[in-house]
């Protein structure tokens, strides 16, 4: 019973977030044609301090609106910040017309955005997924417009994986 309540709660919170993000921020863009909307998504609990610092810097800019999405896996770290929305992974595709989508974790479905950015924090060539899922991961990564990697080792490893598939 508790699991069903969690699922229903997650659905309702995600639905509320999708509606609010799509209408409120679209309205803000109508009022300010130069406004750029950047959506940071935090699907898992991991080290995020450097991304939070980036968000704080971006919020100082005049024509940039930063919004944050989180789910149960990352709620403790993110939900207390300004302009945050609960959004389960499957609901990202319902977010429309944002300028930049950014995540430090590979997501397989994206919101409608001009630019999709993946920031990887691994500094080694450790496997990202099981070998049987690697092809799907690389295919998904190829959908990102920009990929930021933290070391030459990680860059070399990703190039090899892309060449392989």
Segments and roles (model prediction):
Residues 1-43:
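Membrane-proximal basic amphipathic "stem/tether" segments
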Residues 35-165:
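Active-site and donor-binding regions of nucleotide-sugar-utilizing enzymes
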